[in-house]
C-alpha cells in the first residue's frame, strides 16, 4: 500500500521533536452542492526541530512513532 503524503501548515512547534500540522481539505457537499472546507491536525516527527509556526510542509505516513505520531516531515514547501 502506498504511503500517503499530505501538505499543511505548522500550527505548533512547542514539543520536542514534534510539530503539529493543520491539513485542510475541500470537498463538495452532496446535498448543498457547495464547496466545504474541513481541517485536521496531525502530529509529525521533526528530528532536527527546524520547522517553525507558519511553515508549509509535506508530511508522509509512516509506522507509529508514539501514541499520536504516525507522520514524518518530508520537506518544506514554503517558509513563514
Curated annotation (Swiss-Prot):
One of its GO terms (biological process) is translation. Keywords: Ribonucleoprotein, Ribosomal protein, RNA-binding, rRNA-binding. GO terms for molecular function: rRNA binding; structural constituent of ribosome. InterPro entries: NA-bd_OB-fold, Ribosomal_uS17, Ribosomal_uS17_bact/chlr, Ribosomal_uS17_CS. Transmembrane segments: none annotated. GO terms for cellular component: cytosolic small ribosomal subunit. CDD domains: Ribosomal_uS17 (cd00364). Coiled coil: none annotated. It holds the Pfam family Ribosomal_S17. PROSITE patterns: RIBOSOMAL_S17. NCBIfam families: PRK05610.1 (NF004123), uS17_bact (TIGR03635). Part of the 30S ribosomal subunit. Belongs to the universal ribosomal protein uS17 family. One of the primary rRNA binding proteins, it binds specifically to the 5'-end of 16S ribosomal RNA. PANTHER family: 40S RIBOSOMAL PROTEIN S11 FAMILY MEMBER, SMALL RIBOSOMAL SUBUNIT PROTEIN US17M. This is Small ribosomal subunit protein uS17. The lineage of its organism: Bacteria, Pseudomonadati, Pseudomonadota, Alphaproteobacteria, Hyphomicrobiales.
Amino acid at each position: 500500500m502506498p504511503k500517503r503524503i499530505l501538505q499543511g501548515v505548522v500550527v505548533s512547534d512547542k514539543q520536542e521533536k514534534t510539530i503539529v500540522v493543520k491539513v485542510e481539505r475541500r470537498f463538495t457537499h452532496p446535498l448543498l452542492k457547495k464547496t466545504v472546507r474541513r481541517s485536521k491536525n496531525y502530529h509529525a516527527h521533526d528530528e532536527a526541530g527546524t520547522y517553525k509556526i507558519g511553515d508549509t510542509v509535506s508530511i508522509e505516513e509512516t509506522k507509529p512513532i508514539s501514541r499520536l505520531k504516525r507522520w514524518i516531515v518530508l520537506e518544506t514547501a514554503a517558509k513563514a
